[in-house]
């Protein structure tokens, strides 16, 4: 079977001149007059041979060559007369839907079905707002997803990326244009990805946003890009379509950015230069985190700090809020507690207060939950910018001391270096749970030893509950 290369696809990404200096990488490369990037829809298909030459697996090459065939636990029912229509009564929303359908056609992501009498599985196309104020077309595949075979997989996380970045390193970032749409859909699977608008029927020819297997598929295919890179010169972190490159030298970082751009071009990947940052940096935002590699610190981004302050102020002005808003509050604060010193510790009273008044298993999202003065006191800490911006270390601390502690139902003891301290429990204390006694032993040991403030101390105890409690604040 021969594949026809869409016109212009070979110019999907144009690169800076060969002699481009890393220090000059400040603006997107100029396009050659008369040439334009080809449609992004299924744009990797004509480049399957280049992926094969790169060393990608036979499975990856097969998907790129013939398209991704949906894998089902159970074949979904097909219909000839679709009842689901994406046309809207609201003229403003309907205009947006029509524009997005045309945009998807222009991108080569969907095609019009000429034989409307052929059976297919139909879903609804709707719009969700993007960060830049535009709209993202999303096909509601929630019903179709129930028929798909589950694909568990591992992808980069905030924790895994932070664990591998280095203090003093330099980075650049690359963002792909309409990332999922790069991947073609197999001819026989397109009938399951149909949508109707009025009298017209369309089906996706490229991987749509909203398919439950899309993150797995995209991550598995794009991981092959690393085969064309030297891991000794560049560490590449791929968080779906957001990529971060790390080098230990600024000059090498600029050169490796160019190397990766050339590799993307050769593989048919379309880079979004407006969202990419090719200038080597040590202070940057990535996946919702502000990194300062010069000092080796992590911070909440400015946008996330404003989001925290906004919702906290709303709660401080209120006597009660619906459970839905409480969940939003805890979710927003919880998303930042990793980057705020003692953030988890400061969030605990708010979580406990909410769960004492409302239970997910029995309560409704609309239930009004009172805001106590104790909760407001805890929230007041979160509204202080100085508490949110000291930063947390990127790397694990270097411990100056190691403290060994132990406790029983009669007393406690600890030693650090050549110093030893111990004590007996009072009549009231012996009634406490052993986990509380083990934790209290650590506190008493630190007070008795009177260590200088600002030190990092490694505490060794045989109580795993206490270890977890301290590490998780």
Regions picked out by a protein language model, each given a short descriptive name:
Residues 80-87, 136-145, 195-219, 318, ...:
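Short, conserved non-catalytic motifs in the polymerase core
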Residues 149, 278-394:
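C-terminal reverse transcriptase regions that engage the nucleic-acid substrate
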């Amino acid at each position: 079977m021969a594949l026809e290369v869409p016109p212009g696809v070979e110019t999907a990404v144009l690169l800076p001149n060969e002699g481009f200096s890393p220090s000059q990488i400040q603006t997107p490369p100029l396009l050659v007059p008369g040439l334009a990037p080809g449609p992004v829809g299924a744009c990797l298909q004509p480049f399957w041979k280049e992926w094969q030459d790169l060393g990608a697996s036979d499975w990856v090459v097969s998907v790129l060559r013939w398209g991704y065939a949906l894998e089902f636990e159970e074949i979904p029912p097909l219909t000839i007369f679709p009842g689901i229509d994406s046309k809207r009564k609201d003229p403003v929303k309907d205009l947006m839907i029509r524009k997005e359908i045309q945009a998807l056609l222009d991108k080569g992501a969907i095609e019009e079905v000429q034989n409307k009498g052929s059976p297919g599985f139909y879903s609804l196309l709707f719009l969700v707002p993007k960060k830049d104020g535009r709209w993202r077309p999303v096909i509601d595949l929630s019903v179709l997803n129930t028929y798909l075979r589950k694909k568990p997989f591992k992808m980069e996380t905030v924790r895994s990326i932070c664990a591998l970045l280095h203090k003093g390193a330099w980075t650049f970032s690359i963002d792909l244009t309409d990332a999922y749409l790069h991947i073609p859909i197999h001819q026989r699977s397109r009938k399951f990805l149909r949508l109707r608008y009025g009298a017209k029927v369309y089906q996706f020819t490229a991987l749509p946003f909203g398919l439950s297997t899309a993150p797995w598929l995209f991550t598995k295919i794009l991981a092959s890009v690393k085969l064309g890179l030297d891991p000794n010169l560049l560490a590449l972190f791929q968080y779906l379509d957001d990529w971060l490159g790390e080098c230990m030298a600024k000059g090498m970082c600029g050169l490796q950015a160019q190397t990766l751009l050339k590799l993307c071009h050769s593989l048919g990947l379309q880079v979004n230069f407006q969202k990419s940052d090719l200038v080597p940096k040590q202070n940057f935002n990535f996946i919702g985190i502000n990194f300062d590699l010069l000092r080796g610190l992590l911070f909440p981004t400015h946008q996330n700090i404003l989001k925290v302050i906004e919702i906290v102020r709303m709660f401080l002005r209120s006597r009660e809020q619906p459970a839905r808003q409480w969940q939003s509050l805890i979710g927003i604060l919880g998303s930042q507690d990793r980057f705020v010193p003692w953030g988890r510790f400061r969030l605990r009273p708010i979580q406990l207060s909410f769960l004492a008044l409302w239970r997910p298993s029995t309560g409704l999202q609309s239930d009004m939950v009172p805001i106590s003065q104790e909760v407001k006191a805890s929230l007041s800490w979160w509204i202080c910018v100085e508490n949110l911006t000291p930063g947390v270390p990127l790397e694990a601390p270097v411990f100056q001391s190691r403290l060994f502690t132990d406790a029983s139902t009669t007393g406690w003891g600890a030693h650090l270096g050549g110093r030893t301290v111990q004590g007996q429990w009072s009549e009231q204390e012996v009634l406490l749970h052993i986990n509380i006694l083990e934790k209290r032993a650590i506190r008493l040991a630190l007070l008795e030893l009177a260590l200088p403030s600002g030190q990092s101390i490694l505490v060794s105890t045989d109580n795993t509950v206490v270890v977890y409690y301290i590490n998780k604040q």
